[in-house]
Amino acid sequence: MPLAGPLGWMDGRTSLMVSIRLPDQTVKDYPEGTTPREIAAGIGKRLADVAVAAVAQGRIVDLDRPLEPPSPPDSPIDFKVLTPRDADALDVLRHSTAHVMARAILRLFPGTKLAFGPTTSQGYYYDVDSPTRPLTEDDFPAIEAEMARLITAAEPFERFTLPVPEARQFVLDLDQGYKVEHIDDELKSYGIL
């Protein structure tokens, strides 16, 4: 946990506290900006080691995203750490694995365009457009081996948000036109485009 100094938390946090309510109805106070990973570690090392995500205020959140202030402000945040034993964790694990698969495909088949990679009730998939040839089941062993290598490397997942124009440019710079279409479709669904 970061150290507190006379001007607040050394990592830029404020000295405001946020109350969380655990599944056993225990209420604990944490500095605003605390992450679910830090809360899990405070509960126990074993829990932190197996944590997949968390549920805060009814939404699944990643472990490194600071908790948002509750609404209404004086109420505790209902909070639960998700582990592989929780049904909600399965979708998170499948979503993460789809990202690993996409990265493996991009490494093995440079120039591949990624379309959509949703989770399903049966697992996950990724629609891809390979510039040289269609991918087939014969490619699965190599993709699985590259996925295993990526998982063993334990590279962190990094979530970041960008304003829409920057997000569009980011995926354009990656030459991922289907992702630009996806952003535009989302904007249209909200009546923005």
Question: For the regions a protein language model found, what residue spans apply to each?
Answer:
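Eukaryote-biased recognition of intrinsically disordered, low-complexity regulatory segments
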Residues: 16-26
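Short, contiguous acidic and Ser/Thr-rich linear segments
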Residues: 24-34
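N-terminal catalytic cores of NTP/NDP-binding nucleotidyl/phosphoryl-transfer enzymes
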Residues: 32-36, 80-118
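Short amphipathic, charge-patterned alpha-helical segments
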Residues: 34-46
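Short acidic beta-strand-loop surface patches of small beta-rich interaction domains
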Residues: 51-65
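Eukaryotic mixed-charge, acidic/polar low-complexity intrinsically disordered regions
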Residues: 61-82
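Short, hydrophobic beta-strand segments
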Residues: 78-85, 122-133
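Non-catalytic interaction/regulatory segments
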Residues: 120, 130-193
